[in-house]
Structures are given as structure tokens and as C-alpha cells.
UniProtKB/Swiss-Prot annotation:
Subcellular location: Cell membrane
Function: Cell surface receptor that binds to human complement C2a protein. This results in inhibition of the classical and lectin pathways of complement activation, probably due to interference with binding of C2a to C4b and interference with cleavage by C1 or MASP2 such that C3 convertase cannot be formed. This infers resistance to complement-mediated cell lysis, allowing parasite survival and infection.
InterPro entries, sorted: LAPTM_transporter
Record key words, sorted: Cell membrane, Membrane, Phosphoprotein, Receptor, Transmembrane, Transmembrane helix
Full protein name: Tetraspanning orphan receptor
Transmembrane segments: 29-49, 166-186, 194-214, 241-261
GO cellular component: lysosomal membrane; plasma membrane
Compositionally biased region (Low complexity): 303-316
Length: 419
């Protein structure tokens, strides 16, 4: 087990980790395959309800006894919540059935788009202040007459008509986007993850709005639980706590999956830029992270930017040089030994080498050329010195000869003058 301080660092091993020990790419693929299976099962149920309308839970054709239909309604609502955005879009686009009539044969209005409910406005006894007694069949005649009086004789039953066609369309699009996500995670194409990611963002926002709406209308929802024909005693505080706990757990799970898909998108983008070593860490199965890793989900929310390739905490795909080993034989020579070496013992390095493999040959050729040039320069200097010496000796000889001739010529003139 790794220590807790090691999990707080920006190590690349824990940077893209989810579900305690899985890589974000593996978790995204598993999540996408699970969503595909759930959506295929849901589409199968929708096709069955399309060809067999008796399976539709809300279509009770005016029957006010909601004991059996409400059970199926809440079961299907739970299944709707497993598929992103299906339940929310379906609730906003469905209308009551045009031919639906109530018990007295009065036709329902199309403007009502709320769930099946009856307005029971009766006083709760003092003994049931914290308990809500829901018993429709065993109501006293006075309460029934009082309820009918408040309904002003309309006896209008608001029934929501289920439309499987809208749900099939929404689920098909969600299934296609989920297939894109799995394909993008497998083939390392990050742009294929964005459509399903946007659906997840939309579903998370709608789920949060539903939770806030439930918190503001808890007292109205207590009267909607009609799962049995007999009386049901429900604690209002306990019922509110259970519903809020389940809703918060679903919201946290959706937020976790949303962050996992986003981390997979960032990982694929970095992998495309070439800033990661490899896809699957070889030692990711060699340890199990602590509970802190579950809370942080391997996400790095620090101040450093992940997209910056110059960060020292990021892994790199460039080939790493071999570590330099200390060898006394290859160490630098002493200063006295350097002074004993002649100045032209080594040729200067070449200015440019286009061929990396031929650096040694080019250096040797340059050294030979330089030595040859130095020899030629020395020979030219010797020749020049010899020529200079010869010329100087010739000039001195000619000067001596001219002096002798001058002396010979001046001798007769001196003799003539003496005479």
C-alpha cells in the first residue's frame, strides 16, 4: 500500500487513475460498455411497449386505482435515470392521451402535463402529525364529499401519457454517442469523447435541478406514494432523508463519471502531443490505492498546467540519455600535461557535419588536410628563407664588386693628379 503523502504528489502514476486502481482510459471503456448494455436493454423495453401498449404504466385509461400502475411507474422512472437525459427530455415533451377519459366519462384536457394525482384536501388528525395516512379506498363519506366539493364537480383526473417514440429517439442518440466514446477511447481519438461528455454535463445539471425542486416540494410528494391498496404510514423526515440520500448518491456518481471521461479526454490529448511515456502503466496492478485516492479520483487540480510540456512533473516520450558514469581514465588531464602538448598537435573541430555517422572520418580527413597544410607552409617558409638568404648574399657580392671597381677607377685619376 502506498503512503498517503505519495498520493498527494503530482506523480504521473496517480494523475490518471480512477476507481482505486484503474487507468482513466480503462475506466472510460468499461463505463461506455456498461452504458451501451443498459441502453440496449432499455431500447428493447421501449420497442416492446411500442408494439404492446398494455405495458405502458401510465396509460390506465381513466382508472383511478393507481396501486399497480404506480409501482411500474416508479420502476420505469428508476430505469430512466440510468440512461442520461432520457427521463428529463421525456418528461418535458410528453402529453396526455387525447382519448383518455376519467371515471365519469369527461374528456381530459391536453393542457395538463403533470403526473396522475387526485387533490385530497382533508385535514390530518393530530395523532398523525408526523405520519401521513394514505388510504383512498377506506376514506369516510364526509371526506369524499368534501373532496368532490373542492374539485367543483369536474372530477378531472390528470393522467400523463407515455410516449415511447420520443424515448426511443433520445436513447438512440445517446447510444450512438456512447459508441463514439468507446471508439474514441480505444483508438485514441479524444474528439469522439466530447458528444457523450456534453450529454453528461446536461444530465448532471438537470439532475441537480430535480434535487433542488424536490427539496422545495417535499410535502407534496409524500401524497404521491400509492404502492398498496391498504394504508401506508410514512415518516416524513425519514422519507425526505432517504430520497435526498439516493439523489445525492446518484448525483455524486454522475459527477464522478463526468470527471473520469474528462480526465480520459485530457490523457488522450497529452498522448497525441507526445508527452506521456506509455498508455498502460506496468505497475498499476501492483498496488491498491487508499481511500484518499477514491476521493480525489486521481485528478490533479493543482496550479500547474497539464498541457504545458515544459513542466518538470510531466513524463516525456523523448529518448532519455544513458547515465554518465565516472571513469578516472576518461577524466580531464592535468594542467602540466596540457602545457607539454604542442600547439598544432590536434586539428580544430569541423565547422559543420551533415552526416552524424561520419564525424570521425571527417575529423581525421580535416586533421590530415591541416597537417599537410602546415607542412606545406613550413616548406614555403624554408624556401622563402633560402631565397632571401641567397638574394642577400648576391646583393652583398655585387656591392663589394662595385666598391672594388670604384676603387680601381679612382686610382688612375689620383695618379694623374699627382703628376
Amino acid at each position: 500500500m502506498p503512503r498517503a503523502p505519495a498520493l498527494l504528489t503530482n506523480d504521473a502514476r496517480h494523475q490518471f487513475t480512477c476507481c482505486l486502481c484503474l487507468h482513466v482510459r480503462t475506466g472510460t471503456i468499461i463505463f461506455g460498455i456498461t452504458q451501451i448494455i443498459i441502453q440496449l436493454v432499455f431500447i428493447s423495453f421501449l420497442f416492446l411497449m411500442t408494439f404492446n401498449p398494455r405495458l405502458i404504466p401510465e396509460d390506465n385509461h381513466g382508472n383511478t386505482d393507481p396501486s399497480e400502475d404506480k409501482i411500474r411507474f416508479y420502476v420505469f422512472s428508476t430505469l430512466f435515470r440510468l440512461v442520461p437525459a432520457v427521463s428529463d427530455i421525456h418528461e418535458s415533451l410528453t402529453l396526455p392521451s387525447p382519448g383518455t377519459r376519467n371515471v365519469n366519462g369527461n374528456k381530459l384536457y391536453l393542457g395538463h402535463n403533470v403526473e396522475s394525482e387526485t387533490n385530497f384536501n382533508y385535514d390530518i388528525p393530530p395523532g398523525y402529525k408526523d405520519d401521513v395516512l394514505v388510504d383512498v379506498n377506506n376514506m369516510s363519506p364526509s371526506l369524499v364529499s368534501y373532496t368532490q366539493k373542492n374539485e367543483r364537480g369536474s372530477h378531472e383526473v390528470k393522467i400523463k401519457h407515455f410516449s415511447p417514440y420520443i424515448a426511443v429517439c433520445v436513447t438512440t442518440f445517446s447510444l450512438a454517442f456512447c459508441c463514439f466514446m468507446v471508439h474514441g477511447a480505444i483508438t485514441k481519438q479524444p474528439t469522439h469523447l466530447l458528444p457523450f461528455f456534453f450529454i453528461q454535463v446536461f444530465d448532471l445539471i438537470i439532475c441537480l435541478i430535480h434535487i433542488l425542486g424536490f427539496m422545495s416540494s417535499t410535502s407534496d410528494l409524500r401524497l404521491m406514494i400509492h404502492t398498496k391498496t391498504g394504508p401506508i404510514y410514512i415518516k416524513s423526515t425519514g422519507f425526505t432523508f432517504i430520497i435526498l440520500s439516493i439523489s445525492c448518491m446518484m448525483l455524486a456518481f454522475k459527477a464522478y463519471c463526468l470527471g473520469m471521461v474528462w480526465d480520459c479526454y485530457k490523457y488522450l490529448m497529452l498522448n497525441r502531443r507526445g508527452n506521456l511515456l506509455d498508455d498502460w502503466y506496468s505497475d498499476q496492478w501492483g498496488h491498491l490505492s487508499t481511500f484518499w485516492s477514491l476521493l480525489r479520483a486521481g485528478r490533479n487540480r493543482g496550479n500547474n498546467s497539464i498541457g504545458n510540456s515544459g513542466s518538470p512533473n510531466e513524463p516525456n516520450t523523448r529518448p532519455r540519455p544513458e547515465p554518465i558514469t565516472y571513469d578516472p581514465a576518461n577524466d580531464l588531464p592535468k594542467y602540466e600535461d596540457i602545457l607539454k602538448i604542442p600547439a598544432n598537435a590536434y586539428a580544430p573541430p569541423p565547422y559543420y557535419c551533415s552526416n552524424i555517422n561520419g564525424n570521425v572520418n571527417t575529423t581525421e580527413a580535416s586533421a590530415v588536410t591541416t597537417n599537410t597544410s602546415n607542412s606545406a607552409t613550413a616548406a614555403n617558409t624554408t624556401t622563402t628563407t633560402t631565397n632571401t638568404g641567397t638574394t642577400t648574399s648576391v646583393i652583398s657580392t655585387l656591392t663589394t664588386t662595385n666598391k672594388d671597381d670604384t676603387q680601381i677607377n679612382s686610382a688612375p685619376s689620383n695618379a694623374h693628379s699627382s703628376c
